[in-house]
Amino acid sequence: MRLLLILLLAMISPFAQSMTLLNQTPVLEVLDGRLHGSLLLPKSDRPLPVALLIAGSGPTDRNGNNPMGHNDSLKRLAQGLAKQGIASLRYDKRGVGESLALAPDERDLSVEAYVADAAAWIEKLQGDPRFSSVILIGHSEGALIASLAAARQPVAALITLAGSGRPIDDVLREQLQGRLPPALLASSHYLIDELRAGRTHQPVPEALKVLFRPSVQPYLISLFRQDPAQAFAQADAPALIIQGTHDMQVGIEDARALQRSRPDAELALISGMNHVLRIVPAQPQQQLASYNEPDRPIARALTERIMKFLDSHGITPASS
């Protein structure tokens, strides 16, 4: 019995050691202030790959949470990667969470600033001897930021999660169609046209201020200038497009549009996965509930597919 116990301990010991994780809170100095992040680092004697996780639109923090939902999607992804021996850094964007002081007024936000911040994080990670390579993983609007940053600062791999394949103004028009009365729909199309042309507009109908309030218009102008598929095509790194089949915000056709822009990219459709990376039925009520269920596990197939992709490109954990 004693010998059996010793053998069992010997078998699980390397596994237990590989699961030792360090949590750190790095700070990145940029020209106008500081960005704050969370580094999840499997303990290792050798350099290991690190993934930079880039959150989606609006006031979404490093963990994937915003005022509309607390689901810890990116925190859960970081934990899943760590179990496979992949380090990760996720960060609060300027104007969000601990990085609020960088842009307390949303008028100061722009896609260009987000991309510069991501590129600066990449450079910091690439200069850290603890890491062998940098992987970019962008979720939702973060997929666009990741694509643009990858073209600016070369990385070992680019992964998009639920990223749009069309200009965001086109997506917005589609989402508003059928949801607004004719007069408001016409006003929204006019506002989108103005912003697409680079012009702010006041006044804004009260019912549309949540989308087109004057303070967010400068950011929308910078966003509407972007073409996600074109940005993705210009990134040279090996690329993986991941899309859930039960995502109610971004459709499979968006993923296919990204792949059409770059046929060498891999496409992985995760059956039943929604926008916050959970396996959830397509019914709206259950979908909405999952946006506030931080304890619900993320899709197992998600981390499995990421690891398969990384392994195929020689990006392996230190324990491999």
What are these regions (language model features)?
Residues 159-229:
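Accessory cap/linker subdomain of secreted extracellular hydrolases
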Residues 106-127:
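Alpha/beta-hydrolase active-site loop
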Residues 73-100:
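Conserved alpha/beta-hydrolase
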Residues 123-178:
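Primarily recognizes the serine-hydrolase "nucleophile elbow" in alpha/beta-hydrolase
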Residues 45-47, 51-80:
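Short, surface-exposed "cap/lid" segments of acyl-processing enzymes
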